[in-house]
């Protein structure tokens, strides 16, 4: 029996192995815990800037979760093939809604609507497909100094959003109240403490735990309203073109450029995955197919109302730490996200998170984005 269990356990470290459901579930849940808040927070932030109703916010969150699941499945199990190309890297990566696009989406939303963002996302997806096809030829146009500077600037530009949320959200009646600051800094303290001193699941779930603590503390202050949860449906599929699709030149150019940069940056996540967990560098075809899938899934996501996705570095960290590269484990994580994406009550519950809690929890996320940019810049070879 022990030999059988040992053999089954070894399946976890095999890309195409078939571990038992009991072994795969906790590892899959670990991936979900590490990324789910980061996956829905951009949708919540954009909904606030765009002035979406509670029902439309739920639809946006649903689509974001569903598209994260679909994008991950396509990357894990490529099934679309055309000549020498296939859509999906076939590597153990998790896809989720990217914070990198939040500053540009906020800027667009101030003068346009969500449909304009989704239209630009379609253009960005086309750009990513082109980058994927010619990645070997154009990779030199985006050295670490360029991509790192852009990523660092994105991280810094997100801080005003976090501070506004910590204060209660711009335009709220209690903006800047002491209650908001107390809850926000308590949430930030919990996240920071667990991130620096926690181990295992406590460290991986630091943002989720911080939000749970902040959420509970905010209840006595009357910051939580659960009425939207009661009104939400139990089951609903993502709605095709719910927000419409509109094209505006400046929005398309801005998001298209960011898609090109993120396409090249994705090479870092693919490389970290294969080098750290599989003891090899990624093959050119894997990079090419992965970036092309990034473009295709974002086009599909725009049609279903989902925001731009990208590889999630925190999940890359889990894979390289545990060495669990089995695609069925990550596929199960994607399935959990997919189920969450078709349950409006779950999405409605996420909309009840007070803005001060969300602000306190995401400061560390924005800091990590800025640090990633600095690391990229530091890795560049300088000629003096």
Predicted stretch roles:
Residues 1-93, 99-108:
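N-terminal signal-anchor module of multipass membrane proteins
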Residues 54-59, 189-237, 242-268, 381-384:
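Flexible hinge motifs at transmembrane-helix junctions and intramembrane kinks/re-entrant loops
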Residues 195, 315-330, 336-341:
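Interfacial segments of multi-pass membrane proteins
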């Amino acid at each position: 029996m022990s030999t059988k269990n040992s053999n089954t356990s070894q399946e976890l470290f095999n890309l195409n192995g078939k571990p038992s459901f009991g072994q795969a579930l906790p590892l899959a849940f670990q991936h979900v815990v590490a990324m789910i808040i980061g996956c829905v927070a951009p949708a919540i932030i954009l909904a606030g800037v765009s002035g979406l109703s509670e029902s439309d916010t739920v639809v946006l969150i649903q689509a974001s979760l569903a598209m994260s699941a679909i994008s991950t499945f396509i990357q894990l199990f490529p099934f679309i093939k055309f000549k020498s190309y296939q859509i999906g890297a076939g590597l153990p990566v998790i896809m989720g809604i990217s914070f990198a696009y939040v500053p540009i989406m906020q800027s667009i939303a101030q003068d346009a609507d969500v449909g304009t963002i989704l239209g630009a996302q379609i253009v960005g997806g086309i750009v990513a497909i082109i980058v994927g096809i010619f990645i070997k030829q154009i990779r030199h146009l985006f050295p670490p100094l360029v991509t790192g500077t852009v990523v660092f600037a994105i991280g810094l530009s997100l801080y005003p959003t976090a501070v506004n949320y910590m204060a209660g959200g711009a335009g709220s009646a209690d903006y800047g109240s002491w209650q908001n600051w107390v809850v926000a800094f308590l949430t930030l303290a919990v996240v920071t403490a667990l991130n620096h001193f926690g181990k295992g699941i406590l460290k991986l779930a630091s943002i989720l735990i911080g939000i749970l603590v902040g959420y509970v503390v905010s209840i006595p202050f009357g910051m939580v309203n659960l009425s939207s949860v009661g009104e939400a449906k139990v089951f609903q599929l993502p709605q095709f073109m719910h927000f419409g699709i509109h094209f505006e030149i400046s929005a398309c150019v801005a998001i298209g450029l960011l898609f090109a940069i993120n396409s090249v940056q994705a090479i870092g996540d693919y490389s970290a995955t294969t080098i750290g967990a599989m003891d090899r560098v990624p093959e050119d075809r894997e990079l090419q197919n992965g970036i092309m899938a990034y473009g295709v899934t974002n086009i599909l996501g725009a049609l279903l109302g989902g925001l731009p996705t990208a590889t999630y570095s925190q999940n890359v960290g889990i894979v390289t730490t545990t060495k669990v590269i089995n695609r069925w484990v990550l596929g199960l994580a994607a399935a959990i996200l997919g189920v969450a994406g078709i349950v409006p009550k779950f999405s409605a519950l996420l909309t009840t998170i007070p803005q001060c809690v969300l602000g306190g929890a995401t400061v560390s996320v924005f800091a990590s984005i800025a640090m990633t940019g600095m690391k990229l810049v530091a890795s560049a070879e300088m000629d003096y």
